[in-house]
């Protein structure tokens, strides 16, 4: 009888060991992050990797399957719905990603948040150009703390903000999204902005790296001419300060060219 019990116990332990070995490392929350990332990347197909670079929106809680079709995309950005609708929709999308895709990779929910979360019913704050006029980074930090609270209620975990572009081309139609024309001021405002969001669990994505706000003729996304000195002393300065002192979770590249080189496609800039 004792031998039988020991045999059964050994078999149970063997099953447990096999189960533990079969569980993907990337799903083990106790494993080192580097190991989890490496394990997941090794399992992903090229199509799945490209999918992580894409954003897919549905707006229809009853047609999530039709929108995603069993595939894994990187981000979701749902707009023009109420806070409750957003929360419900994001929850359903997360459930779909976990249960109906091959690897169960969660989706990153995002929204614009330059002067309030871009969603129906959210608090609207003054535009960034007015924020910069306060010269008060602590006040900006308090503002983004409030924004983060509203974002989390809706299930939004990242904002596509702040804008660290320098307003040196006043014909550009997005000047109001900047903190102003001075790199130091922009840096101080950007640091306060990012800290307020991220200490409350919402990641920031400063943009547009780099020099996007000085397009030729003021046309959005037109090429920028400036040279190496302006690049480093003006345009890169706010990004260097904010990245070093506030540690944002991501950075958005610009969609223009600097001195004839498309920034996003350049290993030098990236």
Where would I find each of the regions flagged by the language model?
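Glycoside hydrolase catalytic-domain context in secreted enzymes
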Residues: 19-270
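Hydrophobic h-region of N-terminal signal peptides that target proteins for export
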Residues: 10-19
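Sec-dependent signal peptide recognition
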Residues: 2-9
């Amino acid at each position: 009888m004792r031998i039988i019990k020991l045999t059964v116990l050994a078999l149970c332990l063997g099953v447990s060991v096999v189960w533990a070995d079969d569980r993907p490392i990337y799903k083990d929350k106790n494993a080192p992050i580097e190991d989890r990332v490496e394990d997941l990347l090794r399992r992903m197909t090229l199509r799945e990797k490209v999918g992580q670079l894409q954003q897919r929106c549905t707006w229809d809680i009853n047609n999530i399957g039709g929108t995603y079709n069993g595939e894994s995309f990187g981000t979701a950005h749902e707009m023009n719905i109420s806070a409750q609708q957003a929360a419900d929709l994001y929850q359903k999308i997360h459930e779909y990603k976990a249960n109906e895709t091959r690897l169960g990779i969660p989706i990153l929910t995002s929204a614009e948040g330059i002067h309030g979360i871009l969603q129906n019913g959210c608090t609207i704050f003054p535009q960034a150009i007015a924020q910069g006029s306060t010269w008060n980074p602590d006040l900006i930090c308090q503002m983004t703390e409030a924004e983060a609270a509203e974002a989390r209620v809706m299930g939004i975990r990242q904002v596509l903000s702040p804008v660290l572009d320098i307003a040196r081309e006043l014909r550009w139609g997005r000047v109001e999204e900047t903190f102003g024309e001075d790199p130091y001021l922009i840096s101080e405002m950007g640091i306060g902005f990012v800290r307020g969001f991220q200490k409350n669990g919402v990641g920031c994505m400063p943009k547009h790296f780099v020099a996007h706000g000085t397009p030729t003729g003021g046309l959005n996304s037109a090429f920028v001419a400036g040279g190496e000195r302006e690049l480093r002393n003006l345009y890169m300065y706010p990004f260097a300060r904010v990245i070093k002192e506030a540690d944002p979770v991501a950075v958005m590249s610009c969609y223009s060219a600097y001195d004839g080189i498309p920034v996003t496609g350049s290993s030098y800039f990236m």
